[in-house]
């Protein structure tokens, strides 16, 4: 029996939850999120790696599987239909999840037992009127903050409910920001469109070093949206949060750099505006850590329509080069306007953009007479900032408004 347990960890690991318990009970943490819309109430939670092992008796995270617990209460009389693709467009089916659990022992026929065990823990798709259904959807692993939709349809009705659920394991940079302490109430002010254009044109041209003595990359983006809409818009577009710089993230970065592999949450260096490092940073990894898009945002004291106004910088890493100051550094694409426009397209295709326009910024620098950033990389630009009005609801690309700041009165 001991030998069997050593060979069959999938079945012999201590499982504190039966399949029925898994369906009915959320993961053992205090990170549940609840949202009510119309006649449905949805509760979600994401199990950490350790909690997943406790619930399922297996290290699912090592197989890139992250269980998301969902409970949907249908408070109406008509049946509703849950669409799991909103949680993850590439989610794993229950049988696929069970198959991955069995890959380590391909010669033993564990199909029937494991399939039933995992399948019985799954969230159903139909929620009858006046009933409640719960269970797990098996998604790809996201760390830091997991962002997803719960999409439910019924007769002539549709519910789209965004969720942001924290997942332990990373030290995310913006978790340390005290948003209420950034500015005294007396400095915060709501402005008109005309005043917004003037105020943005008077903002600093560029990021600086810590002492504020040397200019770096141009501040070429402005984002208007509350904290949740800002996070959700970028994460829905496939951008990841970044870790703080500490031993764990440095080691992960080093391993990724040496192997050329992807590290989605790699720290970004501190750049400064308003005398402080970025409030939040996002990145979109490509084929390796050497190739990524990253952006930094600083909240300003301005509000437009009651929403926070952020100023920021976006650039595209296209390689790594050696420097005297930092030994190695990322090399940016000098066409910073192309990267700026990529962000417009990216948010538009993610249905996160309500409108956009342009204001003056750093001023033009042409191909033959470029400026330089803090690490000596050249860049050229038309000198403008794009102003992005985020949408809290999915916005069709054909309905995005072009804001004429030149005609703002």
Sequence positions of predicted segments:
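A cross-kingdom signal targeting lumenal/periplasmic-facing segments of multi-pass membrane
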Residues: 66, 73, 247-407
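Bacterial N-terminal signal peptides
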Residues: 1-11
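The feature marks short-to-medium sequence segments in extracytoplasmic or secretory-pathway proteins
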Residues: 75-128, 133
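Short, hydrophobic/aromatic beta-strand segments
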Residues: 78-86, 148-150, 231-236
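Low-complexity, acidic Ser/Thr/Pro/Gly-rich terminal tails and inter-domain linkers that flank the onset
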Residues: 21-62, 200-201
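Short, solvent-exposed beta-strand/turn "edge" segments of beta-rich domains on protein surfaces
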Residues: 52-69, 75-79, 126-128, 211-212
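Terminal, regulation- and interaction-focused segments at domain boundaries
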Residues: 203-233
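Surface-exposed edge beta-strand/loop patches
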Residues: 15-19, 90, 121-187
């Amino acid at each position: 029996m001991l030998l069997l347990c050593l060979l069959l960890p999938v079945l012999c690991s201590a499982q504190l939850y039966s399949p029925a318990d898994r369906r009915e009970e959320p993961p053992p943490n205090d990170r549940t999120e609840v949202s009510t819309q119309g006649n449905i109430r949805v509760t979600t939670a994401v199990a950490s790696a350790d909690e997943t092992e406790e619930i399922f008796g297996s290290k699912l995270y090592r197989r890139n599987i992250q269980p998301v617990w969902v409970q949907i209460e249908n408070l109406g009389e008509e049946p509703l239909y849950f669409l799991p693709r909103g949680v993850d467009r590439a989610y794993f089916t229950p049988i696929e999840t069970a198959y991955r659990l069995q890959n380590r022992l391909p010669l033993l026929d564990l199909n029937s037992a494991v399939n039933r065990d995992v399948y019985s823990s799954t969230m159903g798709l139909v929620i009858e009127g006046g009933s409640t259904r719960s269970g797990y959807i098996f998604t790809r692993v996201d760390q830091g903050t997991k962002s997803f939709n719960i999409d439910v349809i019924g007769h002539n009705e549709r519910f789209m409910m965004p969720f942001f659920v924290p997942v332990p394991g990373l030290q995310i940079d913006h978790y340390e920001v005290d948003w209420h302490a950034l500015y005294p109430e007396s400095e915060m002010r709501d402005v008109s469109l005309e005043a917004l254009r003037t105020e943005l044109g008077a903002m600093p041209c560029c990021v600086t070093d810590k002492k504020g003595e040397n200019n770096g990359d141009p501040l070429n983006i402005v984002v208007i949206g509350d904290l949740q809409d800002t996070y959700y818009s970028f994460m829905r577009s496939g951008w990841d949060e970044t870790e703080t710089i500490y031993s764990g993230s440095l080691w992960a970065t080093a391993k990724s750099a040496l192997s050329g592999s992807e590290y989605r949450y790699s720290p970004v260096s501190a750049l400064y505006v308003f005398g402080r490092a970025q409030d939040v940073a996002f990145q979109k990894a490509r084929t390796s850590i050497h190739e990524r898009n990253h952006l930094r945002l600083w909240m300003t004291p301005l509000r437009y329509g009651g929403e926070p106004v952020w100023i920021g910088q976006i650039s595209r890493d296209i390689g790594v080069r050696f420097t005297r100051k930092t030994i190695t550094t990322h090399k940016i694409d000098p066409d910073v306007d192309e990267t700026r426009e990529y962000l417009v397209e990216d948010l538009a295709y993610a249905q996160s953009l309500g409108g956009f326009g342009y204001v003056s910024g750093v001023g033009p620098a042409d191909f033959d007479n470029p400026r330089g950033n803090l690490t000596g990389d050249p860049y050229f630009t038309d000198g403008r900032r794009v102003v992005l009005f985020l949408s809290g609801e999915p916005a069709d690309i054909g309905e995005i408004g072009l804001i004429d700041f030149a005609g703002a009165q």
